Amino acid sequence: MSELGLFINPKDGGKPIELTKDNYPLTFITKITTHPRYPNRDQRNKSVNVPGLSRYNVVIIPSALCHFLAYGSVQMVRVGSYWTSGDTFHCYYDEFGGPDGWLPGSDGESHFFLYGTLKDNPPDTYGLFLNAGASAAIDNFRSITQENEVAYCVYRKKIYIDVNNNRGYWSLPNDIPNRSSALVFLRPESTSQVLRYDRPNNRIISWGAGWVYVVVFSYGLNLQPADGLTIWNKQGKVVFNSDYIPFFNNGHTIKMSGNVATSSFEKPMFSMDMPNTWLENERVNVNCYLSGFRVENNKLIANRMWTIDFYPSYANYMYNQVVYSSSYCIDFNDYF
């Protein structure tokens, strides 16, 4: 344990955490949804202005980066890269996309959740500042102040998903604020269980029954004064308390290659948001399967689930039985 920091023992009774100059909370900035058709169908580079974005060191958590459509032949539309510059978020599509013709499991929309840490705090900022020692200069972006919109761990449990009684579905609890923008991280106990997060319906879908570790982060909680640390803004609203563990910076993004992605954590939890439709060429048709992931140690492995439809065409071999996806990872040992 460090001698410098804030020790949080949350009210959910789960594993505590220590916030330090190296482990510090991330502020929710915004959620961005993009589509290859809009606002300009002839531009692959899409940009969204986010006022004040340049004030942050930004962490981008992606969802649903790849979609398939068909106009006679099957086409892939994928976000190949994404980044921020100043007050602007950018993403670049590998191909152009049409207004319709999307194969089952695709709608063309990709989602990006932007979190960050302030580069500098305003002169009148107050709160908790984490730095290297009492004599060190304040490291401004490692802080919890009245300027932050901190996301919190609002749910962390080991749950059982039953395919017999609940058809393999598990919905997020209704009392989670901003459910459609919540970050959901999963780790199944069995290496054979296949999971995906169905964001439009705020639920986990499982191929096979089993125990799953779930951690959910969200923002917009109606915070009340806590017995530990409480920070109010100038309007008298509580903007931080130590009843909950905040979403903090100990995470990283991985990208699928050959249907496998590997985390640097020994025992990671993964976001499994909306992987693309799994396509399989079968005679004159391409079968469309729902896709998901299973977990082996620190590896995330793409798998097909069940058939959702077919299309009378043939998919390019590059699209056949392949998931193009990215995942954000957190360390299981930070939460359980």
Language-model features: locations:
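Hydrophobic alpha-helical segments, especially N-terminal targeting/anchoring helices
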Residues: W232, R294-V295
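N-terminal accessory interaction module
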Residues: V48, N285-R294
